[in-house]
């Protein structure tokens, strides 16, 4: 069943999004998933938008990442303790052996942190900004020394993932299925 649903999402992406002016319609995707098999009575699908950037290694660079969609932030300080709505893949910075990550504080600040026994330890609470209205993320003077593997494979990019404010976000070019649970 899982592979059938992933195939449905892939087909939706190919037929609806990867053509000129293709628009993502959440309700249509949900219906397509429900129609995949008679055993599916309904589904809860959460959308996230991901952008990748290729860092300039061993240089303090300001990065601008444009999601081109409004981002979910219903109130100032939303989800601060859990890391806001921004998440990143790992990387190392100059002067540290720790694997670093990015998140946000729900107030427009991008934070740089590493994990100690699973607990976030913030190294810089103002590594950049996130504009929830425009979807622009700015990372200021970030000096990346290396990029971590992603999904067990070598990578040359840092992935940034956010929650859109609307399920019918406009700027999707393709969809990828990502399961968070096997049920």
Where are each of the predicted segments found?
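Acidic, low-complexity glycine/serine/threonine-rich segments
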Residues: 1-62
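C-terminal extracytoplasmic interaction modules
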Residues: 6, 61-108
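Short conserved micro-motifs at the rims of enzyme active sites and ligand-binding pockets
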Residues: 60, 171-172
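Gly/Pro- and small hydrophobic-enriched strand-loop and loop-to-helix capping segments
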Residues: 183
């Amino acid at each position: 069943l899982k592979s059938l649903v992933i195939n449905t999402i892939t087909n939706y992406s190919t037929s609806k999004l990867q053509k000129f002016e293709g628009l993502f319609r959440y309700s249509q995707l949900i219906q397509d998933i429900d129609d995949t098999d008679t055993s599916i009575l309904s589904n809860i699908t959460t959308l996230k938008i991901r952008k990748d950037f290729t860092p300039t290694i061993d240089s303090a660079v300001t990065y601008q990442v444009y999601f081109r969609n409004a981002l979910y932030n219903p109130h100032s300080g939303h989800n601060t303790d859990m890391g806001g709505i921004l998440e990143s893949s790992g990387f190392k910075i100059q002067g540290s052996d720790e694997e670093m990550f990015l998140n946000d504080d729900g107030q427009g600040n991008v934070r740089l942190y590493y994990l100690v026994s699973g607990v976030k330890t913030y190294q810089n609470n103002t590594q950049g900004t996130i504009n929830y209205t425009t979807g622009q993320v700015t990372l200021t003077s970030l000096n990346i020394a290396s990029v971590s593997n992603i999904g067990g494979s070598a990578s040359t990019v840092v992935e940034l993932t956010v929650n859109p404010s609307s399920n019918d976000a406009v700027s999707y070019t393709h969809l990828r299925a990502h399961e968070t649970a096997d049920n």
